[in-house]
Amino acid sequence: PLFLEASTGLNDDLNGVERKVTFDIRDSGIEAQVVQSLAKWKRQALKDYGFRVGKGLYCDMNAIRRDEELDNLHSVYVDQWDWEKVIREEDRTEAYLKNVVRSIVSAVCATEMNLHAMFPQLQDLPLHTPNVTFITTQELEDKYPDLTPKERENAIVKENGTTFLMKIGAPLRSGKPHDGRAPDYDDLS
């Protein structure tokens, strides 16, 4: 969806401080909000459409984030591909998460290889490897204590290539979080 009824509570609070773009729909008197993220909406859709364990959905979200900190990677307008799948309670583990990440990276690498084979003009571009470095934000801060969180991310990727950063919103020993997270659904464990 491009917008949601405000009363559903399905629009993402992101870090809990970003203001939503809100407007009224004249003929219905409903207050609506332009989506900031589909995180909660995806989970509700999985339930509403009866997705089974191991199955999921993907979506192409177009959002407006009026309070986004703008830079060369971030804009007020967001076009984001995302996915969500149903898992069992006992699969809510770090090991399961890492296996899912590895399977996604493997699929991306296989797609990249196929594109290289199909389009000779891509031959000069390097291929990514399916190796993933997993690191928590605390481990990252310990490794690069004098860098900002964003500089740490850049440094670890330069050093290791494909990197999966874990526990992004958890408090660090320095007393500063690596980055903000939605207070009402992000799971830091």
PLM feature spans:
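Structured aminoacyl-transfer and RNA-binding surfaces used for tRNA recognition/handling
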Residues: 1-189
